[in-house]
Curated annotation (Swiss-Prot):
The modification S-nitrosocysteine is found at C590. In the resting state, through the dimerization of its C-terminal domain, HSP90 forms a homodimer which is defined as the open conformation. Upon ATP-binding, the N-terminal domain undergoes significant conformational changes and comes in contact to form an active closed conformation. After HSP90 finishes its chaperoning tasks of assisting the proper folding, stabilization and activation of client proteins under the active state, ATP molecule is hydrolyzed to ADP which then dissociates from HSP90 and directs the protein back to the resting state. ATP binds at N46, D88, K107, F133, R392. GO terms for molecular function: ATP binding; ATP hydrolysis activity; ATP-dependent protein binding; ATP-dependent protein folding chaperone; cadherin binding; disordered domain specific binding; DNA polymerase binding; double-stranded RNA binding. It comes from Homo sapiens. The gene is HSP90AB1. This is Heat shock protein HSP 90-beta.
Length: 724
C-alpha cells in the first residue's frame, strides 16, 4: 500500500518501484556508460510515440485536440536551475498510467534488457526493450514528470531513484495536454545544458522525428535606447515581480553623451543588455526519404549520403523507392564508390542500413534487413508497420521484416541492372563488388539467375574487355551446346593452359575465371540461359564432332587401349583412370578431375585454408584422371616401347615423370617435389654430357641416392627409379 503524506491540501503518495525496475535503475546509475547521450533520444522517442497516439485518436475524434492543436516537442535547458526539460503535446498519462508505466509494473523487456546488459550489450539498446524512460537516470539525479491526459487531472511523478517514487496532483502551471519531463542533472552532466551539445545529440539521433523539436534558449542581446526610455524601463523593473524571467533585464553598459550646451541639447542614448528567449527548430530537414524522388537533386542525395556514411566521396548510384499496400515502407539505398577494406570482416559490426520506424531511429546495423552478400549497400529503411519497441530477437521472427528484405534485395538487383547500362560506372562497381555478386550466386538461390546476368569475365575472345554471359551466348556457334570455362590463378595462366588447346582451336570461346570465389560460384551456377556450364578441366568434355573425327577417336582408343591400361597399373591409386584425350593439341598429357571432384584451382584454395577439414580433403582430391594425347610423338613412342616390352623399367619411369609433369602443368602441386626435381636434374646432366661417376668421384661424401638411377646406360645402373 502506498504511503500518504498530507501537505495542507496536497496529497502525496509514495510507491516502491517494482523489484526488477529498481534493479535496472540501480544498474543504470551505478555502472559507467560512455554513451549517456542516448537518454535524449529515448525521451524524444517517447514524446514522439505520445504524439503519434494523440494524432491517431484525433483521426476518429477531432475534439481530442481541443486541449492543444499543435503537435510538437520542446527542449528547455536552464543552467541556473541545472535542469533540462522536455515538453510534448502528446496524449499524456492518467494517474493510473503514471503509477503503472513509471514504476510498479515491469515491462516484459525489463528483465531481458538487464540480462542483455550484463552479457555486454550496449546501453543504447534500452529503447528496444521498452524501458527507455529510465535512461534519464544516466544523467539526472532526480526526475520530475508532469503530465495531463484528456481524461484526468494534471499529476506530477517524482523520483530520485532511491527505490521509490511519489505521485501527487499538480496545481502548478497547467500544461493543457501532454507531458513535461524535468531532469535535475548530476553535477558532471551539465554539458547537456549547452546549446552545441543538445543540437549535436538531436541531429545525431532524432533529426528525422516527424514532429518539430524546438530548442528554447535564454540569450542576451544589446539594445540602444535613450535615457528617458531607460528611466521608464528602470521604473517598470522595480515594480515587476523578481521571479518573472521573461521580462528583459536591463544593465547599464555605458552611455554616449553629446555636448548639450545651450537649449539645443540632444537626447542621451544608452546601450543595454536584454535577455530574451531564442527558439530554434532542430529538425527542420524533413527526412529526405519521405520526399518525392522527383523533387530531390543529386546534390541533396550526395549530401545525405555523406552525412549518413561519413564517406568523403560521392556515392556511385542511388535507389529511392516506397512500397505501399498491405505493407508500407520507404527506402533510400546507396552504392559506395569503393569497397571498405574490411568488407568481409565477419566480426566487425556493419553500420550499413539504418532502420527507422515511423521516422524514429531504431538501429543502425540491422543484419535481418539485407543478406550478407549485399553488406556494402548503405541507406535508410523507414517502416510504418514495425512496432517501435522492436528488439533484435523480435526482428529475427518478424514476417514484416522478411517482406521488407525481399523487396530491398529486388530493388538492389534492379539498381545493379540499371548501373550495368553505364559501362564506365559498372566497371568501377564490378571491380569493387564482384566478389559480393559471386557470393550471392553461391548463397541466394532465389535470385541466382538475375545475379548471373551481372557477372563479367575475360574470355578467349574478349581481349582486355570483360564480357557478360549473355554476350557469350549471343556469340556461340550453332553446333555449340555448352558454355566452356576454366578456373585458375590468372588470365595468363589459364590462357596458356593445355586444357583450352582443342576448344580454342575449334573456335569455341572459353570463359576465364580467375578469382578463388569463382570456384564456389560455378558449383551453384550449373547453367545460364538454358546452356550448361562445362569446365574444360573436368572429365567428360564433349566437343561437337563430325563423323570423321568420331571414327578417328574410336581408332585411337583401340590403338592406345593397352598403353592406357599399363599406365593405370603403373600409377595405381594416383589416378582413377587413364583415357585418350579429345582436348589436347600440343601437350602430351593432362590431369583432369571427375565431374564432382575439385579442380586443381579448388584444391589449391582448399589446401590454403588454415581450418580445413582433412577428411573431406582426402575424399575430394582423390578423383584425378590422366588424359593422353594420341597425336603427340612422346605418347606414340611410349606406346611402341610398351608394346615391345611392357615390363621395361624405363617405361615405368617415364610414365611417372609424365604424370608428375602433367600434374604441374595442370595446376596441381606435387606431394614430393624433391624426388621430381632430382629426376629433372639427372636429365639435365645427361643432356649436358656430365658423367655421373665423375661427379661421385669428386664428391666422395655426397652419396647419390640409390633410388634415382641414370636414365640411360646398362640395365643395372641406367634406369630411373620406380615410384610407388
Amino acid at each position: 500500500m502506498p504511503e500518504e503524506v498530507h501537505h495542507g491540501e496536497e496529497e502525496v503518495e509514495t510507491f516502491a518501484f517494482q523489484a526488477e525496475i529498481a534493479q535496472l535503475m540501480s544498474l543504470i546509475i551505478n555502472t559507467f556508460y560512455s554513451n549517456k547521450e542516448i537518454f535524449l533520444r529515448e525521451l524524444i522517442s517517447n514524446a514522439s510515440d505520445a504524439l503519434d497516439k494523440i494524432r491517431y485518436e484525433s483521426l476518429t475524434d477531432p475534439s481530442k485536440l481541443d486541449s492543444g492543436k499543435e503537435l510538437k516537442i520542446d527542449i528547455i535547458p536552464n543552467p541556473q536551475e541545472r535542469t533540462l526539460t522536455l515538453v510534448d503535446t502528446g496524449i499524456g498519462m492518467t494517474k493510473a498510467d503514471l503509477i503503472n508505466n513509471l514504476g510498479t509494473i515491469a515491462k516484459s523487456g525489463t528483465k531481458a534488457f538487464m540480462e542483455a546488459l550484463q552479457a555486454g550489450a550496449d546501453i543504447s539498446m534500452i529503447g528496444q526493450f521498452g524501458v527507455g524512460f529510465y535512461s534519464a537516470y544516466l544523467v539526472a539525479e532526480k526526475v520530475v514528470v508532469i503530465t495531463k491526459h484528456n481524461d484526468d487531472e494534471q499529476y506530477a511523478w517524482e523520483s530520485s531513484a532511491g527505490g521509490s517514487f511519489t505521485v501527487r496532483a499538480d496545481h502548478g502551471e497547467p500544461i493543457g495536454r501532454g507531458t513535461k519531463v524535468i531532469l535535475h542533472l548530476k553535477e558532471d552532466q551539465t554539458e547537456y545544458l549547452e546549446e552545441r551539445r543538445v543540437k549535436e545529440v538531436v541531429k545525431k539521433h532524432s533529426q528525422f522525428i516527424g514532429y518539430p523539436i524546438t530548442l528554447y534558449l535564454e540569450k542576451e542581446r544589446e539594445k540602444e535606447i535613450s535615457d528617458d526610455e531607460a528611466e521608464e524601463e528602470k521604473g517598470e523593473k522595480e515594480e515587476e515581480d523578481k521571479d518573472d524571467e521573461e521580462k528583459p533585464k536591463i544593465e547599464d553598459v555605458g552611455s554616449d553623451e553629446e555636448d548639450d550646451s545651450g537649449k539645443d541639447k540632444k537626447k542621451k542614448t544608452k546601450k543595454i543588455k536584454e535577455k530574451y528567449i531564442d527558439q530554434e527548430e532542430l529538425n527542420k530537414t524533413k527526412p529526405i526519404w519521405t520526399r518525392n524522388p522527383d523533387d530531390i537533386t543529386q546534390e541533396e542525395y550526395g549530401e545525405f549520403y555523406k552525412s549518413l556514411t561519413n564517406d568523403w566521396e560521392d556515392h556511385l548510384a542511388v535507389k529511392h523507392f516506397s512500397v505501399e499496400g498491405q505493407l508500407e515502407f520507404r527506402a533510400l539505398l546507396f552504392i559506395p564508390r569503393r569497397a571498405p577494406f574490411d568488407l568481409f570482416e565477419n566480426k566487425k559490426k556493419k553500420n550499413n542500413i539504418k532502420l527507422y520506424v515511423r521516422r524514429v531511429f531504431i538501429m543502425d546495423s540491422c543484419d535481418e534487413l539485407i543478406p550478407e552478400y549485399l553488406n556494402f549497400i548503405r541507406g535508410v529503411v523507414d517502416s510504418e508497420d514495425l512496432p517501435l519497441n522492436i528488439s533484435r530477437e523480435m526482428l529475427q521472427q518478424s514476417k514484416i521484416l522478411k517482406v521488407i528484405r525481399k523487396n530491398i534485395v529486388k530493388k538492389c538487383l534492379e539498381l545493379f541492372s540499371e548501373l550495368a547500362e553505364d559501362k564506365e560506372n559498372y566497371k568501377k562497381f564490378y571491380e569493387a563488388f564482384s566478389k559480393n555478386l559471386k557470393l550471392g550466386i553461391h548463397e541466394d538461390s532465389t535470385n541466382r539467375r538475375r545475379l548471373s546476368e551481372l557477372l563479367r569475365y575475360h574470355t578467349s575472345q574478349s581481349g582486355d574487355e570483360m564480357t557478360s554471359l549473355s554476350e557469350y551466348v549471343s556469340r556461340m556457334k550453332e553446333t555449340q551446346k555448352s558454355i566452356y570455362y576454366i578456373t585458375g590463378e590468372s588470365k595468363e595462366q589459364v590462357a596458356n593452359s593445355a586444357f583450352v588447346e582443342r576448344v580454342r582451336k575449334r573456335g569455341f570461346e572459353v570463359v576465364y575465371m580467375t578469382e578463388p570465389i569463382d570456384e564456389y560460384c560455378v558449383q551453384q551456377l550449373k547453367e545460364f540461359d538454358g546452356k550448361s556450364l562445362v569446365s574444360v578441366t573436368k572429365e567428360g568434355l564433349e566437343l561437337p564432332e563430325d563423323e570423321e573425327e568420331k571414327k578417328k577417336m574410336e581408332e585411337s582408343k583401340a590403338k592406345f587401349e593397352n598403353l592406357c591400361k599399363l599406365m593405370k597399373e603403373i600409377l595405381d591409386k594416383k589416378v582413377e583412370k587413364v583415357t585418350i584425350s579429345n582436348r589436347l593439341v600440343s601437350s602430351p598429357c593432362c590431369i583432369v578431375t571427375s565431374t564432382y571432384g575439385w579442380t586443381a584451382n579448388m584444391e589449391r584454395i582448399m589446401k590454403a585454408q588454415a581450418l580445413r577439414d582433412n577428411s573431406t580433403m582426402g575424399y575430394m582430391m582423390a578423383k584425378k584422371h590422366l588424359e593422353i594425347n594420341p597425336d603427340h610423338p612422346i605418347v606414340e613412342t611410349l606406346r611402341q616401347k610398351a608394346e615391345a616390352d611392357k615390363n621395361d623399367k624405363a617405361v615405368k619411369d617415364l610414365v611417372v615423370l609424365l604424370f608428375e609433369t602433367a600434374l604441374l602443368s595442370s595446376g596441381f602441386s606435387l606431394e614430393d617435389p624433391q624426388t621430381h626435381s632430382n629426376r629433372i636434374y639427372r636429365m639435365i646432366k645427361l643432356g649436358l654430357g656430365i658423367d655421373e661417376d665423375e661427379v661421385a668421384a669428386e664428391e666422395p661424401n655426397a652419396a647419390v641416392p640409390d633410388e634415382i638411377p641414370p636414365l640411360e646406360g646398362d640395365e643395372d645402373a641406367s634406369r630411373m627409379e620406380e615410384v610407388d
